[in-house]
A protein has these predicted regions:
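Eukaryote-skewed repeat-based solenoidal scaffolds used as protein-protein interaction platforms
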Residues: 1-158
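Terminal, non-catalytic domain-edge segments
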Residues: 31, 142-268
């Protein structure tokens, strides 16, 4: 959940429950979130802003969060729900960058694995969250990742459109601009039109994640978890754009070989 919503009260009719003046969203989520996951964490953060209850990282819930973020093997495979839970947990534990959280071993690797998946897929929304989470945890993202986010954000176009659809690229605009702000980079400078707006991102190609997965699938039982062995096979399989993205991912940080070992799901 985004910081602009924190402190809001619940809209009872929208939530389809009897009116209850001043119902805080944190209380609502504590009452209605049964996953035992991010909803509870977010609710605890909201309540702490009112001076109620324990800190986000305290007790059994805090331990559960730390156990989750430290299981880096979870984040070597595409799982958007788990990926966003990871970044949001770091946001909450760091109080959105107000403090450096004490994180267990494995957390940094979890963030890097998630960032590699996002970069390979050219998913700039998720990659921006990973970069923000890395900075909030006291680490620096790969400059290649932040350069990609900056280029994506600056290519976004905002235009007035009376019948603008609800589903557009606003969230990508928001989170990539936010990540650039955290990194002290200048964000999109353009005059916002009046009225209903449409946010449009310029996308090219499909990234390298799907071609990489297709290559491994085509190799079947012959694929290996050893990136050194697999590298020439994979690179010869990919097209020019995917090839370039994969090479950039490989040099973006120190964890690519370990990431590939988990992603390949093959014997060493």
């Amino acid at each position: 959940m985004w910081p602009q919503y924190i402190g809001h009260t619940a809209n009872a009719p929208l939530l389809r429950r009897p009116p209850e003046p001043g119902l805080d969203l944190g209380v609502f989520f504590l009452q209605h979130d049964h996953s035992g996951g991010e909803g509870w964490t977010w609710a605890r953060r909201l309540l702490r802003r009112r001076g109620v209850g324990p800190q986000v990282g305290d007790g059994a819930l805090g331990q559960r969060l730390r156990d989750f973020v430290s299981r880096s093997v979870t984040f070597a495979m595409p799982n958007r729900k788990a990926a966003y839970e990871l970044t949001h947990i770091i946001f909450y534990l760091s109080d959105y960058g107000r403090q450096i959280p004490e994180l267990p071993d494995g957390t940094l690797k979890s963030l890097h694995f998630t960032g590699l998946l996002a970069f390979l897929d050219q998913d700039m929304d998720l990659l921006a969250e990973v970069c923000a989470a890395l900075r909030f945890s006291g680490n620096y993202p790969s400059p290649l990742w932040e350069d990609a986010i900056a280029a994506y954000h600056r290519a976004l176009r905002v235009q007035a459109e009376p019948d603008a659809p609800m589903q557009d690229d606003y969230h990508e605009f928001l989170v990539t601009g936010w990540a650039m702000k955290i990194a002290d980079r200048s964000s999109l400078a353009q005059t916002m039109p009046q009225g209903a707006l449409r946010f449009h991102a310029s996308r090219s190609g499909q990234g390298a994640l799907r071609p990489l997965a297709a290559c491994l699938n085509d190799m079947g039982a012959q694929r290996r978890a050893d990136w050194g062995y697999m590298r020439p096979h994979v690179l010869s399989y990919l097209g020019p754009d995917s090839h370039a993205i994969l090479l950039a991912a490989e040099r973006s940080g120190p964890h690519f070989e370990q990431f590939f070992e988990g992603f390949a799901r093959a014997r060493a």
